[in-house]
Every structure is written in structure tokens, then in C-alpha cells.
Swiss-Prot record:
Binding-site positions, S-adenosyl-L-methionine: Q294, F323, N328, E344, N379, D400
EC numbers, comma separated: 2.1.1.190
UniProt entry tagged with the keyword Protein transport: no
Family under the similarity heading: Belongs to the class I-like SAM-binding methyltransferase superfamily. RNA M5U methyltransferase family. RlmD subfamily.
Broad class of enzyme this protein falls into: transferase
InterPro entries listed in its UniProt record: 23S_rRNA_MeTrfase_RlmD (IPR001566), MeTrfase_TrmA_CS (IPR030391), NA-bd_OB-fold (IPR012340), SAM-dependent_MTases_sf (IPR029063), U5_MeTrfase_fam (IPR010280)
Biological processes, Gene Ontology terms: rRNA base methylation
Ranges annotated as biased composition (Basic and acidic residues): 1-10
Protein name: 23S rRNA (uracil(1939)-C(5))-methyltransferase RlmD
Length: 491
């Protein structure tokens, strides 16, 4: 394996036992925070062992907290005082972040140094792998990190005209609330988009449709910024003129969404197309604002390069890219492998991935053609051993599922292995299984450590694989979202 290195900030072996009761030598009411949970709450224990989840508290702090919810064996509380502060506590970079009334809920970890955020996420990944999948990676991959601010190239901004306040709000929701935060800036958005928040509020306030525009979706490419306006009623000519004036003043492209996602269309045809580049592979990916693309393009470029380095596909390899989307991994794989198959659940995305493949093939320099690629639409949540075998032998797999994970895929692989070793209750295999071999290596990119752990448990304990490496990808700094990557090799 190339590239795995030990991360220096792992707190302890995830298979070890955590303390089951809190300290008894602190003053009454004080709590020692020992870790953070998946919602970025500090975790402490009372002397009787009862777990307390504390908003705003950090590991290794001594705190007091006000309980607002009680259950038999746990409580939820909010931080009221810090008696010993963590050296990793920092001043938040956004005035709208915090525990105060009306605070924005878009970020949860701005009070924690970004390096420590990564360590917490690594611990969350390892804990999930061990406790849910009974899997411990042989090696910890170096975390993938990038800019902590101005990284969020995709966002869904809620919009509401609040008559009582006499203003329009545009932004994320408040913490634990359906109300929209009164945001003037947002430092995780690109600077030019953050600077547009107040002008967007003024724009919507000036429109006839101010009460029927509930959302603006942001999609930034390398050179184009697109805004998708959801409107519940037809827009007047005056409103269309206001949108055009805003676009000219701020250098953005307006798209309109009168109904469902299929109705999204440009306000005015023509103009440049949204795209992002993967320069390590000479690939350019055109996309529409409603297509799924990664929120953080800086991290995505590193992620694709790292994933392909770990996959290590060569000119003799046939590779399957499961949940291929627009071809974010498929097209780079086609620069290295003999053949690649991209399989995706959405017919529309399959059509878009074919278009992207053709465009990039046409634009390749002479002598650097992409390997043959096939794109297939299939429900990947209903996979069977027969379907897996019908896809043919692949030397390596790249798996990049949504939050639901790739359970059906892992289960089909496990069923085949169990049948071949003669396990009791294993399903019978079709005659076509003879000669079919599972992939030698699987690189699994995950946006949910719980479903990764579940699938890893199947691969390791039932499908004949070992987890040779795993690590986090800090795709969403300052949030509790844990993106990760794991590598499995056949035993």
C-alpha cells in the first residue's frame, strides 16, 4: 500500500474500554468532558455513571452544564461555565456561531481547532468501525485536509420574508430550530458568495414574489456561480428584470425552479457552463446545479487522487465504479485502467456521465485516450449475487455510496463467499458463478461512518476481506460530518 501513515492524534485504541463512571474528586456539579459524539457534543459522566451530552463543551474540559432533557441513563445539557479550558478551544471565525439565541446551525465545531476536529472525526470513524462492525483497520490513513474557510461551493439557503421583523432572511437554519438565522456573512461560503447575502436579502425584499420564494440553492464551479431560485408562483416580468440586474451586478447565473427538480432551467440561455477540473488527470467535469457534486472542490481533487493511488489500477485491470454519479471517479480511472464500468441508480446521472466521458474523450491529447467505459443504470440497493456475477469479473472496485451505504452490494459479495466455503444457510449460486472471482481490492469512500462500519463488518467477517487502511476526509470543516475512506483487500 502506498500513502498510509499513522495519524499522531488518535486518543486511544478504539477496542479498549471507556470509563463507566465519572470523576468523584471534582467540586459538586462539575463534569469532566472525555470525548465528543457524532453531533459534536461533549460527552461526560456523572459520578453514578450517567452519560451527559453537553452542547459547546470540548474534550478534557471541566465544565458546569444546565440539563434540558433527561432519560434514565443519559441527559442532554448546555454549557454554562468552563472551569478548565481545553487548549484546543479557539475563537469562532463567524459572528453567527455559538450557543446564543438565534445562532446559526450550519456549523457545530468552530470553537475547536481544526486539527483537533480532524482527530475527533478520526476517533468517530474508528469507534464506529469497531463497535458497529468489529473491524479495526490495519493502518490509519493520513487525513485529507484543506482550507477551513471559504470551502463550501454548494449550499441550500432558506429564504423567508418575516413581516414581524420587517426583513427578508437568507441563510441556514438556527441551531435546533426551523427558524432561519439572521445572517449577514458566512465565512464557510466562498468570499464572493458570503458578500452576496445582504444583497440577496435586499433583492428578495424588492420582489413581488418575496413571499413565495422559499429557497436559493448555490452551486459554484471553477469559474461560474449559479443560483437556483425556488418560486411557488410564476414570476412577474418586473421580478425577472430584478434577477437579471442582480446577475449583471454580481456576476452570477440565475436558474429557476417553479416545481420539482426536473423543472430547473436557466433564466436566460447561453453563457458559460458550470464545470470543475481534476487537473491530476486532465479531466473537466461539466455539471448542472442540480447534479450531485462534492461540496468542497479542493478536498475532492485530493480525494480523487488519493483514492486512485490506493486503488492502484493498471493497464491490465478492469474496474467497476459503483454509485458513479457524474463520473467523478470513473473518468480518472479511465486514464489508468484497461476498462472501467460506471454503475449508478439514476438514469439521468448515467446519461450525464456518458456525456462527460464523450466530451473528455474528444478533448484528450493525441495518444492519451481514455480507456473504454460503460455506464449502466441499476438499483444498487437491490443487488443479488446473480446480478453481481452478471457484471463480470472486475479486478478492483471503487465504491462511493450515499449515506445509506452499500449494504446490498456487500451482502451479495458475502453471500457468494459464504456459498463457496460451504457455510450453512448460504444461498445456492448460479452456474455462471464458476470462474467468477471477487475483486482483489476495494476502495470505499463513505459519507456516513455508521453505514461504512456495517458494510465493513460484512466484507471482513463474511466476504473474505481484510481492512488494510482507513482514514478521514475533512470535507466539511467546522461541522460534525465525517467523510472517510477505507481500503479492503481479499484474504
Amino acid at each position: 500500500m502506498s500513502d498510509p501513515t499513522e495519524h499522531p492524534e488518535i486518543l486511544q485504541d478504539p477496542s479498549s474500554s471507556a470509563p463507566v463512571q465519572g470523576r468523584t474528586d471534582l467540586p459538586p456539579g462539575w463534569l469532566e468532558v472525555t470525548s465528543m459524539d457524532m453531533d459534536a457534543q461533549g460527552v461526560a459522566r456523572r459520578p453514578d455513571g450517567k452519560v451527559v451530552f453537553i452542547d459547546g463543551a470540548l474534550p478534557f474540559e471541566w465544565v458546569s452544564a444546565s440539563t434540558h432533557r433527561k432519560k434514565n441513563n443519559w441527559e442532554q445539557a448546555s454549557l454554562t461555565a468552563i472551569h478548565r479550558e481545553s487548549p484546543q478551544r479557539v475563537r469562532p471565525g463567524c459572528p453567527h456561531f455559538g450557543l446564543h439565541a438565534g445562532a446559526c446551525g450550519g456549523c457545530k465545531m468552530q470553537h475547536l481547532h481544526v486539527g483537533a476536529q480532524v482527530a475527533v472525526k478520526q476517533r468517530v470513524l474508528e469507534d464506529n468501525l469497531w463497535h458497529l462492525g468489529k473491524v479495526k483497520a490495519e493502518t490509519v490513513l493520513r487525513p485529507i485536509e484543506g482550507p477551513a474557510w471559504g470551502y463550501r461551493y454548494r449550499a441550500r439557503l432558506a429564504v423567508r420574508h418575516v413581516e414581524k421583523k420587517g426583513k427578508v432572511l437568507v441563510g441556514f437554519h438556527e441551531r435546533k430550530s426551523r427558524y432561519i438565522a439572521d445572517m449577514e456573512v458566512c465565512p464557510v461560503l466562498p468570499p464572493h458568495v458570503s458578500a452576496m447575502l445582504l444583497p440577496l436579502r435586499a433583492l428578495i425584499a424588492s420582489m413581488d414574489a418575496r413571499d413565495t420564494c422559499p429557497q436559493i440553492e448555490l452551486a459554484c464551479g471553477d469559474d461560474v456561480t449559479a443560483l437556483v431560485l425556488r418560486h411557488l408562483e410564476p414570476l412577474s416580468e418586473a421580478d425577472l428584470g430584478r434577477l437579471r440586474s442582480f446577475a449583471a451586478a454580481h456576476g452570477v447565473q440565475w436558474w429557476l425552479q417553479p416545481k420539482g427538480p426536473d423543472t430547473v432551467h436557466l433564466l436566460d440561455e447561453g453563457g458559460p457552463q458550470l464545470n470543475y477540473a481534476l487537473p491530476d488527470f486532465g479531466i473537466t467535469m461539466p455539471f448542472k446545479p442540480t447534479d450531485f457534486t462534492q461540496v468542497n472542490p479542493h478536498i475532492n481533487r485530493v480525494l480523487v487522487t488519493r483514492a486512485l493511488r490506493l486503488l492502484d489500477a493498471g493497464r491490465t485491470d478492469r474496474v467497476i465504479d459503483w454509485f458513479c454519479g457524474l463520473g467523478n471517479f470513473t473518468l480518472p480511472i479511465a486514464t489508468q485502467a484497461r476498462e472501467v464500468v460506471g454503475i449508478e441508480g439514476s438514469e439521468a446521472l448515467v446519461a450525464r456521465s456518458r456525456e462527460n466521458y464523450r466530451k473528455n474523450q474528444d478533448d484528450r491529447p493525441q495518444g492519451q485516450a481514455l480507456a473504454p467505459a460503460t455506464f449502466v443504470a441499476r438499483n444498487l440497493f437491490e443487488m443479488t449475487p446473480e446480478m453481481l456475477i452478471a457484471d463480470g469479473v472486475a479486478d478492483k472496485w471503487l465504491v462511493d455510496p450515499p449515506r445509506e451505504g452499500a449494504f446490498a452490494l456487500a451482502k451479495a459479495l458475502a453471500d457468494i463467499h459464504q456459498a463457496r466455503i460451504g457455510a450453512e444457510d448460504a444461498p445456492a449460486l448460479p452456474a455462471s458463478a464458476e470462474g467468477w472471482t471477487p475483486p482483489q481490492r476495494i476502495v470505499y469512500v463513505s459519507c456516513n461512518p455508521a453505514t461504512l462500519a456495517r458494510d465493513a463488518g460484512l466484507l471482513v467477517h463474511q466476504a473474505g476481506y481484510r481492512c488494510v487502511a482507513a482514514g478521514v476526509v475533512n470535507m466539511f470543516p467546522h461541522t460534525a460530518h465525517v467523510e472517510s475512506m477505507a481500503v479492503f483487500e481479499r484474504v
